[in-house]
């Protein structure tokens, strides 16, 4: 037996909301080493292992301690080290990381006397794996990677191929956490190659399953689907089952013991299909998994996932029959589960789904105090009763983490029915438990919930102050667990949009009153919270907390103090715009302007604005554009004029990221914003902004692109002319076009590039999903992560910085309201000081004309934002072509990052 045969679930500190980023595959639960150990010690250890696998961690802990004492009395140091390792794993499950670290260290200390025996090396590899798991939990990723590399070498030494594969999967997750995507990808490819070389077997099926799940966790859902499908087909063949792995085909499901593994794979396929937003396929996989499995936990997990997905996708005024059928049958099934952490969380999961139905108006509000009178399954009364039983089970298991979740979930049910006293008491009890075990991933939820309750329970000032304090602590905890939040466990009911983003927005809403003036301190706090939300969005986009942020003042970036930073925030009932102005006293540098408008109305108008940019007549666009101008710019006009600023830097929120701010229209002056005196740039936040301006030196450009049609994308005949003209303005250190425009060539050219401007004229797609954000090369779609890795080769070559990255023919994904997040993603991951990109694909001739004019402006030492503005005004003038006056031609170009 080895690490690999114990699936990831056994290593998870399970929660109904979060899968910790980089959660490694656990050290395997092995039997004691051979020798003359006393039967009592061996039986104790086996009993402890059984309890551990049943998720009864506190009883397992007691038995492991007895087993350790028995082995210690016999002087069995190797078995002592083994049991210490299990104690560490058990303490990790209980969330007691200090004790877990203590026993892990003691286990390794007992293994200091080196040996070449198989037993010694096997236990050493397990101990190294456990130590790496702890180090990752503490954020010591490089140390974790080192230990997993040592574990891999140890498994290799004893010829344990499954163990080697498991520890290499852990390495890949650590590399991903460190942002070393190419190395992570290479490692995962090595794992796949190693598995492919093995004969078909249960071991290979399990290996592919684990690899597929890992790929989903790190965000490669396409590859995850392929690997899981391979695992499924192999196991279907082994168990003589046909058509079960294809959701498009009809399958006859007849459960047999041999098909249990197949059910497990189908469950994972459902999770990956859900991550791909293939709702119907995910439901089909979940249904097959539930029908095929004879294990209660697998059946329930599949049905709960199916119910949650159906609830999310339901838009009917009444509960659909498919949902109602599950809601009516699941409570009885929950009652049959033996007490364990999984059964507690299954109860919580079900209750949270009922709460979602209630919040969407599909369940009537009811008094949930008298739980003995519950009759209907689809009621909050039933939900409360089920969770209360779960809490009792968690108490009996001495599982503090589960107790906290159960109490907090009960609090959320009482919150919904506005039974405020009970809601507050339960939430505070849940928070106390979470803080007691330093479980910040749970604590932030109850701090947020407490903030909502205090905010809703009347007007007393002490409640408002208490709500602000609760939200403040919730945001601080969110920032401290960034790495844990970015990998979503699709087995659980967790969503960034539902359970992270609202914390920031509600906190901003509380800090910025609808009427009256906020204090200077609250205004500054709100600005910082907005910056934190931008960072959290990018973390969620990359599924990695790999971005470094540093507090920065605008005057540190713009020494001439000619820049205003504008933060429009979309709140539920208003647009709050914070403006940071230069040349002001410290307590007066921030100003707030509020426009009362429902969120839905505002966002509908913004989406309409984007659609009208493609209308033949500019007048249709202008009618909507001037409305958005009145909401965003009109209220701050006087402040901008009085401060004498020349640069406007926008930190855009939500749907605003997809529209061209420069094309907002002033109906009074009858001019676009860009026609005023302002240079315009956008940034995902000052804290992510490299402050250095464009280097004052002889500029060089590295240019490349595609002019021919490739991969269903049309030809770009204007690219050749565009690149040729750039050469007449700049010294170019390289030029790669069409067949030469490959990732390998780009990387090779970049390594010797002395720095300056990197100009890539090619198709590309920006999306709110990292896997769908790419630029097109001759032979592949270069994903944003791989593109980042290619650009990192320039940083590693000790050449000058890339001052400006230009992507002149890209576009945002149609129908994706947050697609512009992909632009910000490329901008911050590229390492370039600034990025010039397009919101939509533009006419070839117009693009070439604007880019050539932009380079002419840069050559005259104009700042980047100023150069872009002048180039856009050149097209807008109609001098080259009257058609180009339409904002469709000049407005999509946006400068992200440093504007100087």
Q: Locations of the language-model features?
A:
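Non-membrane alpha-helical segments in proteins
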Residues: 42-53, 78-93, 126-133, 137, ...
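Alpha-helical solenoid repeat scaffolds used for protein-protein interaction
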Residues: 5, 11, 181-183, 189, ...
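Inter-helical turn/loop elements of alpha-helical hairpins
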Residues: 55-58, 91-102, 139, 179
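Mid-chain, structured segments of secreted extracytoplasmic proteins
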Residues: 72-109
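N-terminal leader/linker segments that initiate helical-solenoid repeat arrays
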Residues: 3-82, 86
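Catalytic cores of enzymes
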Residues: 284, 334, 551-600, 605-610, ...
